[in-house]
């Protein structure tokens, strides 16, 4: 029997696994997709919010401020790309200045460090490319940018290293209470656990309803984005927000940790995991972004994408044991600031176990920390040493991002190895650049096939069914109709 079964391995599930792996508990993760961080965590704004937006007294307010501080420590410890660049919330007319004042007061009540209100002149001195309509801004220096999929992956890898089991392609399709805990129906059979942690993202309400009376409803909400080439990456130095509204924090313009510029999202209620981009949605995003930063060159876009976030009808995170279901712990409604709050949310699970007297003493032999080779960032002498030790690091496969064969092979041999082309991309950035894998994709496919010992026809782009190759073109008798 498991001590803890975690359903879902996005950033919240990964953070819960990382936190629980510090204790001698038999913990396992059950993830429906074929990789970690393969839903909301891979498609969002990649912002660690300062914490001025949530209403004081809410779980969001407390956990956002706690979480962004913890994230900084975790990213440093686990070698995750992170940059504390600060954020600016713009008032685009004098009429919006009272809204900034309200956010400022929220921030003070929530304990956000260093926030201050800026005049129009101070704002444009920090960001000369902003609209001349800017009437002022709220500056929050603790806001940061991060690589969200690497963040989740790093925590999951360290958790696995320390004994947490990870079951991919393992959706939980049934939950029954037992005398000693819970029984979960999975593709490999029924699994029993004393505790269940529901970190199922946009499906968390459905998972909850398997175990307890209905308590909350999640409305999946799609947000569409532009990712612009690195030629636009210096367009702004801070995360640029507009005044938030009932649909969220609005359309932002921000640098990324990889040197690009990200613009978005809109907010469109959808059914399920609908991540299609639409002409209307992208037109709205570009028009809204130009209100903040007029000179963005959208012709430099290298990719459009959409993510789906879990808007919950409670208006706040749903965290705690479900009513009438002891030992079933919800971590639900993790819309923004879910990414920012994740490590603090994970500590809530530990507090629940501790409160029930089920938390053993922490491990004394815990193996924390993680490093990753980033060849292009190394000084010349370190590159030479690395190539001398392993010539694979001397063969550049992804020219856009200068990613070597050695780095791709590393991604295929980690605690949670990549099994797909997009899985490689999320681990080492191969295919993330200007050509979006047009040049390196076939070589990455070849390396996956060779390393995993599978037919090239079986290599996936990402999710199940996304086979890249359909047939061998020179095979005798092949029909290409």
For the regions a language model picked out, list residue spans one by one.
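C-terminal catalytic lobe of FAD-dependent flavoproteins
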Residues: 248, 257-258, 273-396, 403-416, ...
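Flavin-dependent oxidoreductases
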Residues: 15, 175-180, 184-264, 268-278, ...
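Glycine-rich FAD pyrophosphate-binding loop
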Residues: 22-42
């Amino acid at each position: 029997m498991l001590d803890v079964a975690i359903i879902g391995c996005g950033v919240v599930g990964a953070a819960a696994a990382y936190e629980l792996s510090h204790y001698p508990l038999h913990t396992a993760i059950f993830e429906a997709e074929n990789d970690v961080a393969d839903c909301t965590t891979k498609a969002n704004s990649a912002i660690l919010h300062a914490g001025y937006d949530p209403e004081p007294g809410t779980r969001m307010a407390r956990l956002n401020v706690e979480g962004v501080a913890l994230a900084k420590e975790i990213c440093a410890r686990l070698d995750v790309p992170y940059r504390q660049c600060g954020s600016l919330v713009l008032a685009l007319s004098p009429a919006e200045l009272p809204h900034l004042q309200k956010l400022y007061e929220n921030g003070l009540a929530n304990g956000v460090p260093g926030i201050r209100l800026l005049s129009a002149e101070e704002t444009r001195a920090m960001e000369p490319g902003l609209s001349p309509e800017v009437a002022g801004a709220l500056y929050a220096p603790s806001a940061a940018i991060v690589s969200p999929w690497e963040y989740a992956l790093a925590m999951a890898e360290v958790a696995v290293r320390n004994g947490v089991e990870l079951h991919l392609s393992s959706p939980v399709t049934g939950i029954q209470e037992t005398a000693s805990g819970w029984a979960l129906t999975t593709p490999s059979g029924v699994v029993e656990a004393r505790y269940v942690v529901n970190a199922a993202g946009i499906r968390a309400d459905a998972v909850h309803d398997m175990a307890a009376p209905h308590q909350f409803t999640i409305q999946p909400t799609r947000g569409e984005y532009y990712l612009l080439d690195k030629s636009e990456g210096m367009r702004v130095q801070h995360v640029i927000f507009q005044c938030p509204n009932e649909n969220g924090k609005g359309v932002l313009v921000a640098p990324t940790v990889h040197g690009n510029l990200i613009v978005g999202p809109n907010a469109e209620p959808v059914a399920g995991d609908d991540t299609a981009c639409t002409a209307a949605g992208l037109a709205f995003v570009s028009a809204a972004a130009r209100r903040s930063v007029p000179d963005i060159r959208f012709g430099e876009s290298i990719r459009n994408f959409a993510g789906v976030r879990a808007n919950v009808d409670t208006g706040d995170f749903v965290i705690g044991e479900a009513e009438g279901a002891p030992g079933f712990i919800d971590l639900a409604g993790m819309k923004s600031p879910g990414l920012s709050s994740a490590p603090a949310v994970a500590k809530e699970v530990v507090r629940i176990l501790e409160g029930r007297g089920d938390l053993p003493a922490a491990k004394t032999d815990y193996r924390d920390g993680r490093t990753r080779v980033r060849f292009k960032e190394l000084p010349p002498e370190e590159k030479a040493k690395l190539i001398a030790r392993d010539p694979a690091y001397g063969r550049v496969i992804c020219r856009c991002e200068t990613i070597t064969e050695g780095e791709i092979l590393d991604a295929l041999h980690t605690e949670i190895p990549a099994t797909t082309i997009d899985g490689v991309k999320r681990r080492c950035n191969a295919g993330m650049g200007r050509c979006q894998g047009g040049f390196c994709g076939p070589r990455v496919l070849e390396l996956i096939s060779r390393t995993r010992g599978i037919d090239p026809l079986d290599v996936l782009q990402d999710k199940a069914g996304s086979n890249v190759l359909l047939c061998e073109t020179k095979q005798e008798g092949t029909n290409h109709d």
